[in-house]
Amino acid sequence: MKNYLIAALWALCILNIEAQTDSTTRHRPWLAVGEAAGINAGVWAMNRYVAHAPFAYIDFKTIRKNFRTGFVWDNDKFSTNMFLHPYHGGLYFNAFRTNGMSFGWSAAGALGGSLMWELFMETEPPSINDVLATTAGGIALGEITFRISSSLVNNHARGLERVWREAAITLISPVNGFNRLLRGDMWRVNTLRDAWSNEESHQTCATLSTGTAWLSPNGKLFKGTINGFLKLKLEHGDLFSKPYSAPYDYFEVQADLTIRQQATMGDVSLLGRLWSHDRESTPGKKLIWGLFQHFDYIVKDTTSNNRRQVPVQISGAAVAGAGLIWINAPQSDPVKLKTSLFVNAVLLGGTHSDYFSVLERDYNLGNGYSIKSFNAITLGKYCRIKLNYHLMHLFTWRNKIDSLYYRTLDPHYLDVQGTQSNTLVHVIQGGCDVALSDRLSASLDLYYYRRESRYDDFPMVTTNTLRMTLGINWWLSNPRKLSPASML
């Protein structure tokens, strides 16, 4: 199973090997390899000489042992495996992307960087789930941060504008900022315009939302916690009027911070077009079908009676599949409709487990499928009603924890996906946006999360969680009123 999963990642890289490159940047493959290796060396050095982490004390014996042991399912905490590893993969990806390499070669670079870390850079056995999450999640986060940061490039800018642009580029994609510094592009003023900053073909619509969020971990209407939230939504490219040209020429991003005593990441959802074809029957009516990549990281925490609960814990770190989108938006018609359906394979997903707790892991890993549907109707220019549904069916196969031998084994070598089970996760979202001006709108959203975990050796567990948000949205750039194409 593990070999098949890694082979699937290699196939994804090879299929996209000739995908679009950055034509304005000279190809520097060896520099890209060196930077990816340097990222690993830097992280290892921090752990070895600053943090003195036990796993960083490597030598030739530990490397040989890793090759002999092979890949296992590790027991790191949810945020590490399902978000930080994909972010790390995005750094590998951009080491190649920002050195002029294609999407496919950059995907291969993310896989290579992950394999280098797992096999050579730590004493713990190599992790198959880390390779999957780092590569697939790194492709999504890497290409998105590359395109967003590159769209901010303006080689004409001077003074304060140039400073904030270069700072934003580096914040969004540290590797892109590093390479611009290395090449001297960060301060060089010229008349050349970067290929990725073409506003005509790479428009970005960004909205920032803030407000109040109510969360009930037990599904009870009048019991729960109230916190603030800060949400960023990005729609990059034009799905409605621009045909497919390259992977991720269209993508959407939604990132949600929960504001309590401190801000905590609670929701990251990504949708990127890998390939598509479309047919427009009449002006304003278009049917689009193709392949799409998804990334989901959803954690909703609450504290009640001095006890921490985890009502929602969902991850789709390696997800891709087919999608069908129908848009009915004639320019003269005040009522515009969008509906979509995505059927995906889940190479790696994760959900909360009620019976598994080893080291830092309290969740199940697994494979399965997911179905997503996004639906919205826009009434005039000032009101949009939406109804979205997300189903994930995750199967946890590998579990040897009941064996006496595995109970006495070093837990780092346990090699289990979790408690053997199959889990259905349902996420239903309904909401309404009302525009207040060209750049301001108010929104009310309701969420229902349901988890049905059927365990082979334990009683079934069902959880229900309700969430409601009331907020104000501010269009940061390119206000499009209420875009009928936006799906997240």
Residue spans for each PLM region:
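Hydrophobic alpha-helical membrane-anchor/signal-helix detector
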Residues: 26-53, 79-120, 132-149
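Repeated loop/turn-to-beta-strand initiation elements of outer-membrane beta-barrel proteins
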Residues: 104, 148, 240-244, 282-286, ...
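Transmembrane beta-barrel strands of outer-membrane/channel proteins
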Residues: 173, 206-212, 249-257, 289-297, ...
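Detector for outer-membrane/organellar transmembrane beta-barrel domains
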Residues: 296, 310-411
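Residues on the lipid-exposed face of transmembrane beta-strands in outer-membrane beta-barrel proteins
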Residues: 143-144, 212, 228-238, 268-280, ...
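Outer-membrane beta-barrel "beta-signal"
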Residues: 182, 464-488
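Residues that define the transmembrane beta-barrel architecture of outer-membrane proteins
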Residues: 137, 202-204, 222-232, 264-270, ...
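Extracellular loop and loop/strand-boundary signature of outer-membrane beta-barrel proteins
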Residues: 218, 305-312, 355-362, 412-419, ...
